[in-house]
């Protein structure tokens, strides 16, 4: 009887995977049915249910190993049986390493879950992530901006026409004219950061770049997203600002774990946690920022929120309050932490390679000025930033799509419908097929001379497949604020390197610092980055 029930349940569930709620209802209904039919005491019913679930688990494991459509794809044996393999890697903060390791071990296509594949094929990337690519997978159901409001952010929308409408609204906030309007705020916050650095220099102390860049991106994010001095209304000191960023990291880490099993989301939200207070404080912060700016209305304040309050010119659609709240959370997270991550990695790599820093400083000092148009034309500056994003993409293992009805043939491989496919830009960016000496920081690979020499025979044949670089993601889901991020990063780098010489603080361990970075949806850098700043004799401030 138990075997029959478990076999029937498996036959049903493998065709339509239940949600956590549906499975709980199934268990409760079955318990009630057993108690009525068998007239057994409660303890006996519990034992029967345990036996049934054990048999069901064995049947599922055997099916996934030997009869599942994805059995032909290699991968870790545990990953074929349970999503717990990738969940464990996410919990340990090493998903980016895992995706790279399995690609090197098993090849282009690897099974990383019972119904999920990972690929490092750039041909598959362009097909699946392109303009006519596949819809987003279930990992977006536990998206970072799917909060208590119930609304979808532009990041978590799965419906492609709806996403296109939302992107048109967002695009207005990042036109060249709109971006130029954010420049005064960036310049003011840069001056504030330089003043703090000068104070630390006078004390003879090192500067924690993790703290200073964190406060800088917090202030600029608040100014550009919600209006001038918006962040100061809630966080007046550096400690307050950095605390918000730390709390944000806790939220990001939680989402980075549960997105591998989205049905865990309501359970995790309800589960008591030592970080619950921090997560709630971050939610209150984003809610307060949203409500404060919403109540101000359109007005003359041309911040990002001004454009989000407008309508789509093609359809006349306006965002609902729940959608605005979700997009506000997205603004806070992607507007701050991703920029800080790239800048921290950038300065770490330059400090580890002083010859590259000297070459970049020479280019900056020779520039006619440090305006955004002038900086955008500096080839070596752009090369160093690109190389940083190649080695340390701020969102390193998070692109998931789902195969549409009818299945598909990609690169000669039959992909069944409903199969999730994941891309890791960290793994692809470090693939020797696409980049020579892929593990090394070599900004010269991006210079025009190196590109012109591609394919030339010599001591070493340079490989640079630009299709394999997607630091700002790719396709319809690519970063809408890419040009703003470029401008902000160039200005920060140029301002610091034309005013100071940098060196590691005494006792600072760059290897241990880099080893402390974890990926949980985004790349998280939380340890202090102690750097000695020496003012240049002629500063360009």
Swiss-Prot record:
GO terms for molecular function: heme binding; iron ion binding; monooxygenase activity; oxidoreductase activity, acting on paired donors, with incorporation or reduction of molecular oxygen. The keyword Calcium does not apply. This is Cytochrome P450 67. Its cofactor is heme. The lineage of its organism: Eukaryota, Fungi, Dikarya, Basidiomycota, Pucciniomycotina. Heme binds at residue 479. SUPFAM superfamilies: Cytochrome P450. Its EC number is 1.14.-.-. Pfam families: p450. Belongs to the cytochrome P450 family. Keywords: Heme, Iron, Metal-binding, Monooxygenase, Oxidoreductase.
